[in-house]
Regions:
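Secretory targeting and sorting signals
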Residues: 1-24
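Beta-strand-rich domain onsets/edges
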Residues: 23-49, 53-55
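Extracellular interdomain linker/stem segments of modular secreted and single-pass surface proteins
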Residues: 29-31, 125, 129-131
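Cytosolic terminal low-complexity segments enriched in Ser/Thr and acidic residues
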Residues: 39-42, 110-112, 129
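Short flexible loop/turn segments that cap and initiate beta-strands
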Residues: 59-74
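Local beta-strand/beta-hairpin segments that build beta-sheet-rich folds
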Residues: 76-78
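Glycine-centered loop-to-beta-strand initiation motif
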Residues: 80-91
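Enriched for extracellular/lumenal, surface-exposed ectodomains of secreted and cell-surface proteins
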Residues: 95-124
Length: 131
């Protein structure tokens, strides 16, 4: 009798610890970027501040994400967002140019067979005139 109870207990423990197999799923979370500039018309050589937020319903997409300030399709600066998705760039403007901020997307909690991704986004363009 003692042997049967021991075998039953061992079987129950084995089943409880093994758990159900993981189910594969995708989570593709959209993002969007805002941008504001401190001054749209400056003297050549003046500094301006570009700031905004990376927005998403999923906090993991907003927090600690790499965003890039782009001018003439070239990356001029890179920053990590704050826990709430905020970013700020301070740049010297030497000539009139159009700027935008880009987020390339990222993978989150990459554990096979799950696919969790924050989708890429970019802000609207802002033109800063330097005279």
């Amino acid at each position: 009798m003692k042997k049967i109870v021991t075998i039953g207990l061992a079987t129950t423990m084995l089943l409880a610890l093994s758990g159900a197999p993981a189910q594969a799923h995708d989570r593709l979370e959209p993002t969007r970027l805002t941008i504001k500039v401190s001054d749209k018309s400056v003297d050549k050589g003046d500094k301006v501040t570009f700031q905004g937020k990376l927005k998403s319903d999923w906090k993991k997409c907003r927090a600690n994400s790499k965003v890039k300030l782009v001018r003439k399709q070239k990356v001029v600066a890179t920053k990590m967002t704050s826990p709430n998705g905020s970013y700020k760039f301070r740049k010297k403007v030497k000539s009139t140019a159009t700027y935008r901020v880009k987020f390339s997307g990222k993978k989150v909690n990459v554990v096979h067979p799950h696919n969790h991704r924050c989708l890429s986004s970019q802000s609207k363009s802002v033109k800063v005139r330097a005279t």
